Amino acid sequence: MRVLLQRVGQASVEVDRQVVGEIGRGLLLLVGVEPEDSAADIDWLVRKIVNLRVFSDAEGRMNRSVLEDGGEVLAVSQFTLFASCRKGNRPSWSRAAPPELARCRFDQFVAAMSEALQRPVPTGVFGADMQVALVNDGPVTLWLDSRQPE
């Protein structure tokens, strides 16, 4: 499972020109699922994300987590995080989980994140054509891969 994490001043996601999820200050998570992902991958990512110290303390150092800062989280499914661009000019999506499995794992991820934060996590609409708007804060952008924990 992969997550592209961005610290934001605000973010929203629209489907058919209707806002379906939005947050103020917090984290925008673009989430990709591969077939081998399990509950262990979800648990590792959720623990890592809620405890990452990416928000500034009183001295301006990145020393506070989204939990400590009271920030919000918006999660958007994105199978393109598993694109392969090795051959030719058209990306291949063969490493991404099939839609049914990806939806299940994404929903499990969102439920686990909501439980860890003790509040709902807004999302986009799985499989829909979405427009994501965000105001990067920093910018702070991190790449997390449960198969390559660094």
Swiss-Prot record:
One of its GO terms (molecular function) is Ser(Gly)-tRNA(Ala) hydrolase activity. It is found in: Cytoplasm. One of its GO terms (biological process) is D-amino acid catabolic process. InterPro entries: Daa-tRNA_deacyls_DTD, DTD-like_sf. It catalyses: glycyl-tRNA(Ala) + H2O = tRNA(Ala) + glycine + H(+); a D-aminoacyl-tRNA + H2O = a tRNA + a D-alpha-amino acid + H(+). A motif (Gly-cisPro motif, important for rejection of L-amino acids) lies at residues 138-139. The keyword Transmembrane does not apply. One of its GO terms (cellular component) is cytoplasm. CDD domains: Dtyr_deacylase. Keywords: Cytoplasm, Hydrolase, RNA-binding, tRNA-binding. It is an enzyme of class 3 (hydrolase). PANTHER family: D-AMINOACYL-TRNA DEACYLASE 1 (PTHR10472:SF5), D-TYROSYL-TRNA TYR DEACYLASE (PTHR10472). A Gly-cisPro motif from one monomer fits into the active site of the other monomer to allow specific chiral rejection of L-amino acids. Belongs to the DTD family. An aminoacyl-tRNA editing enzyme that deacylates mischarged D-aminoacyl-tRNAs. Also deacylates mischarged glycyl-tRNA(Ala), protecting cells against glycine mischarging by AlaRS. Acts via tRNA-based rather than protein-based catalysis; rejects L-amino acids rather than detecting D-amino acids in the active site. By recycling D-aminoacyl-tRNA to D-amino acids and free tRNA molecules, this enzyme counteracts the toxicity associated with the formation of D-aminoacyl-tRNA entities in vivo and helps enforce protein L-homochirality. Homodimer. NCBIfam families: D-aminoacyl-tRNA deacylase. This is D-aminoacyl-tRNA deacylase. It comes from Laribacter hongkongensis (strain HLHK9).
